[in-house]
Amino acid sequence: MAAQARRTITWFPGHMRKATQIIEDKLRSAEAVVEIRDARVPLSSINPSFEELVTRYDRPRVVVMNKADLVSNADKSRIIRYVEGQQNARVLFTSAKQQSKSIMNKLSKEILKETGRPKFRHGGVMALVVGMPNVGKSSIINLLRSGLRLDGGSSHRQGGGGKKRRRTNVAKTGATPGLTRHVSPIQIARDPSVFLFDTPGIMVPRIESDDVGMRLALAGIIPEKVVPAESMVPFLLEIMNNSNNLQYASALKLPSEIIETGDAELLMDTVAQNIGRGGSGARLDAARHIMAKYRKGDFGKFL
């Protein structure tokens, strides 16, 4: 079954326009950029707005490919060749499953490698953290915060008795893209000091193609209210069949007929029956079930 005709995909809420200006203002005083991308969509999650700003202000960049546990080693090698060769940026692979200390050490090492040690002993390096919504930016920030607590404290201390302030300013995370608005800078290294300043996740005013838009929707970067789950299933099925990745069939307990025909509607109806859903919302429930399994990596590692 051929993929359904797709409408033009756009998602650029008003707060993102303001956030773009915030990022540019902060970039003037930052010495480096840490860009978080989703490793499953390493090219589609490139934001041309970030590219233009990094070039204009000539800032060194470390690209953190998050959710790297969901892509193969062969794909990681291709990602490194492209990003380091075409975008002149260092690449670091990570996932929320990693130990926070490991991420802190790797990231601070890469930032210092790109910027050099600060000129003054008591100075530090400030890096701006940017990325599209829902690429795991807030999860990484919070993981780094927890790693800093385990490491024996932070710059957020009260004077006198040395008691730590209660940490209430934590980056919110969730399945809703574009949730993060603002969090304070965090320190991820000492001697020399390295600070990260988080920023809101932003999209671009115009997505270059429907293919890119659908890939971003599959990864959860564009919310379901913009691209319904039922619209994603035909696109995902086409990608998996074209890549000869049939792991989804066993994960969803599907008959061979669906693999042979590529019928997305039959796929959703079969899954709905398998998970005990019926009625008018059965296909939607099935589509959400399929997307949840894909995003967890139950269908294998592929881009």
Identify the function of each model-found stretch.
Residues A2-A32, R40-V41, I46-P48, E52-V62, ...:
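Helix-rich effector regions associated with P-loop NTPase G domains
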